[in-house]
Amino acid sequence: MMNDGKQQSTFLFHDYETFGTHPALDRPAQFAAIRTDSEFNVIGEPEVFYCKPADDYLPQPGAVLITGVTPQEARAKGENEAAFAARIHSLFTVPKTCILGYNNVRFDDEATRNIFYRNFYDPYAWSWQHDNSRWDLLDVMRACYALRPEGINWPENDDGLPSFRLEHLTKANGIEHSNAHDAMADVYATIAMAKLVKTRQPRLFDYLFTHRNKHKLMALIDVPQMKPLVHVSGMLGAWRGNTSWVAPLAWHPENRNAVIMVDLAGDISPLLELDSDTLRERLYTAKTDLGDNAAVPVKLVHINKCPVLAQANTLRPEDADRLGINRQHCLDNLKILRENPQVREKVVAIFAEAEPFTPSDNVDAQLYNGFFSDADRAAMKIVLETEPRNLPALDITFVDKRIEKLLFNYRARNFPGTLDYAEQQRWLEHRRQVFTPEFLQGYAEEIQMLAQQYADDKEKVALLKALWQYAEEIV
């Protein structure tokens, strides 16, 4: 690295393997990261480390079959989650780092936020403080396929639709990726895909990189004029290359990072004919339950989640034809919407009454219940700076009700030796509430079902045996 007194911008490619799909209630197993310069040349040593699972948690069997990481391996190679979080935090908070991965905005970043939340680090600052940012290559690949597909091979899945699974893309483009779902292998594969797009479609790549920033995206969005844009998102469906023309109707009434978009390729008649209550109900009805009713062609775009938005003409006529997007239909819908501005009030009303948010009484699931105050954040910093053995004597008051529970869990999971007798009893009671007879019976049945399903697969059977032994040991 050139040391000219100025900090160099770097990319930090990373990937988690986890013991389950829920970012708040499941736990990390393995983390891998590689830092590169702006041209994707590796700098520094690759980082791979494991997280020791705490004794109030059992992994999801299906997840272990995918990753091949058993809780025994994570326990043998890993450190407690407090130490695991500290290492990730120090990598993520190097100034001028762009933290990225593959599907990280929806998955890995949520895991990071929850790991930091459980371990007394700021869940969000890593992605913006000190000139830091985040980005996600999954949507870059989707955008490349839809908007500038030349020069890259695009694999199809069994349904004949484009596949954006990392292992399919690497194979189709002759990139080494032998050990898919090993965190390090996935990181190298992601770097290779980034290089591929940067070489084959440099203008698109640079555009998307610049527009990962919400202020750049805001400049594209013109609500008063309903200026149409092209949008690429997995929510739009692979059958049309995850792409459509959209128009911004209004900003979300409560979340200033969300804009309400109408999908111009959809059927807009519900927006004209139905009232906001009916629209809201239909919007939150699963597609399979809609019957003959037309879906509501409205979607939120969160400008702080690196969405792909570009000028409408970025989608060329030949690509719209290839993706089966009817340009005239979209233009007709745009004209109708502009003639019916009352639709704006309707969609704002849909989102003014938020979708039903069921609060959980489990503190692990309460990250999004609210931000911590400055005073509480300062107190949490003191927790981190205190030697674990001195935590019991820490005389500190918190305003937010979550923190006392978080601190107890933090001590019990990471430093059980610091619990006194009464606290040990409290933790035992917590574990009893987690490992109920019903839960354990369901867990055993799931392992048995998978063991029958994969009876001929020695490796999978061995993983399931290890899980069974682990459960018997810790419960």
Question: What are the roles of these predicted feature ranges?
Answer:
Residues 1-41:
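Entry/capping segment at the start of metal-dependent catalytic domains
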Residues 26-31, 35-36, 41-69, 90-202, ...:
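Metal-dependent phosphoesterase core characteristic of DEDDh/y 3'-5' exonuclease domains
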Residues 253-430:
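Long, charge-rich C-terminal accessory regions
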Residues 423-475:
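C-terminal non-catalytic accessory extensions
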Residues 210-290:
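Acidic catalytic cores of enzymes that act on phosphate-bearing nucleotides/polynucleotides
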Residues 2-4, 18-23, 48, 72, ...:
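N-terminal glycine/serine-rich phosphate-binding loop of ATP-dependent small-molecule kinases
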Residues 67-84, 91:
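Metal-dependent phosphoesterase signature
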